A protein has these predicted regions:
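Short beta-strand/loop motif that positions the catalytic acidic residue
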Residues: 183-185, 190-192, 196
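Short, surface-exposed "cap/lid" segments of acyl-processing enzymes
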Residues: 7-8, 13-61
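Catalytic histidine-centered segment of alpha/beta-hydrolase-like enzymes
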Residues: 222-236
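Catalytic nucleophile-loop/oxyanion-hole region of alpha/beta-hydrolase
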Residues: 57-89
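Short beta-strand immediately N-terminal to the catalytic nucleophile in serine-hydrolase-like folds
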Residues: 92-97, 124, 191
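Gly/Ala-rich beta-loop-alpha elbow adjacent to hydrolase catalytic centers
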Residues: 96-101, 105
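Hydrolase active-site cap/lid region
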Residues: 111-170
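Conserved alpha/beta-hydrolase "acid-adjacent" motif
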Residues: 197-203
Length: 254
C-alpha cells in the first residue's frame, strides 16, 4: 500500500515523540485525506501518524479481482503498514478506522501477524455488521427483501464468484462484529452519529453493550463519518482523553 507520514510537531510545547504510532485507515470510496481529521488528537499525544491506502482504493495498486473485500481482504495491507511502523521506530500502534476502515481495522486486530503490536482501536462511523447493512440498504432503496438476501448469497457463496467478480467469497458473518463480540481483544473507542443514515449506529451501540472492551460515544446531527465536522473540539478531546487513559494502561495480551 501507499502511505504518507505525519510526525509530531517539533516545538517546545509538543509532547516528546511516542513509540506508539497511529495507523489511519480510510473508508470505502474515500481517500487518505479523510484521516486528517484525527491529526489534532495524534499530534497532542505525540504520535507519528501513518495515513495509508489499500488495495482498490484508487491510490494503492489494485488486487487481482479489483473488488473491495469489505475488510475481508484489505486487512493484509494494514498488516504491511504495521510492518513499516515497527521497522521505523514504533513499538506498538493504534488503529484508526473510518466506515469500512473500521471493519478493516477489526479484521487486522483479529488476524494480522502483527496483532500483538496493536494497543487500541479508534473507529468513526464503522461498518460493523454487513449482513444488517445490506438489508438496511435494501429497505432504504425500497427493494424487495429477497434482493438483499440474494446479494448476501452472491457475495458469500463460493460457486457464485464468477458472477460477482470476486476472487474469493466474503464470509459476511466473520465481518459482522456484534455476532463476534467475544472476539474483541483490544480496547476500542467508537464514535458514531445517531443521525448516520448510510451506516446506522445501532450495531456500534450493540457491540459496546456486548463487549466490555468497547466504549461507544454517540454524536448527533452528523451524516456518515462527519462526527468531527460537526464538533471537532468534542471529537478531538474525546479521542485524546480516551487514548491517554488507554495507553497508560497495561499492554493487552493475546
Amino acid at each position: 500500500p501507499d502511505a504518507s507520514l505525519t510526525h509530531p510537531q517539533a516545538d517546545q510545547d509538543a509532547p516528546r515523540p511516542s513509540t506508539t504510532w497511529a495507523i489511519m485507515v480510510h473508508g470505502m470510496g474515500a481517500t487518505r485525506a479523510e484521516t486528517l481529521r484525527a491529526l489534532d488528537a495524534t499530534q497532542a499525544l505525540g504520535l507519528t501518524s501513518l495515513h495509508m491506502s489499500y488495495r482498490n482504493d484508487r491510490e494503492a495498486p489494485a488486487s487481482e479481482d479489483g473488488r473491495y473485500g469489505l475488510g475481508f481482504t484489505e486487512w493484509r495491507d494494514v498488516d504491511v503498514a504495521i510492518d513499516y511502523a515497527l521497522t521505523h521506530g514504533a513499538r506498538d500502534v493504534v488503529l484508526f478506522g473510518w466506515s469500512m476502515g473500521g471493519s478493516i481495522s477489526l479484521q487486522t486486530a483479529d488476524l494480522a501477524r502483527n496483532r500483538r503490536a496493536i494497543r487500541a482501536l479508534v473507529l468513526d462511523g464503522p461498518a460493523l455488521d454487513w449482513l444488517e447493512l445490506i438489508q438496511y440498504h435494501t429497505h432504504l432503496n425500497k427493494l424487495p427483501l429477497t434482493i438483499g438476501q440474494l446479494g448476501v448469497k452472491m457475495i458469500s457463496h463460493p460457486a457464485l464468484t464468477s458472477f460477482t467478480g470476486l476472487k474469493e467469497p466474503i464470509n459476511l458473518t466473520r465481518i459482522s462484529w456484534p455476532h463476534r463480540a467475544d472476539d474483541i481483544t483490544r480496547p476500542t473507542l467508537i464514535l458514531h452519529s445517531t443521525d448516520d443514515l448510510f451506516v446506522p449506529y445501532q450495531p456500534s451501540a450493540r457491540l459496546a453493550e456486548l463487549s466490555p472492551l468497547v466504549d461507544f460515544v454517540p454524536f448527533t446531527g452528523a451524516s456518515h463519518t462527519r462526527e468531527w465536522n460537526i464538533d471537532p473540539e468534542r471529537w478531538t478531546t474525546t479521542v485524546t482523553r480516551w487514548l491517554t487513559d488507554t495507553l497508560a494502561g497495561p499492554q493487552p495480551q493475546g
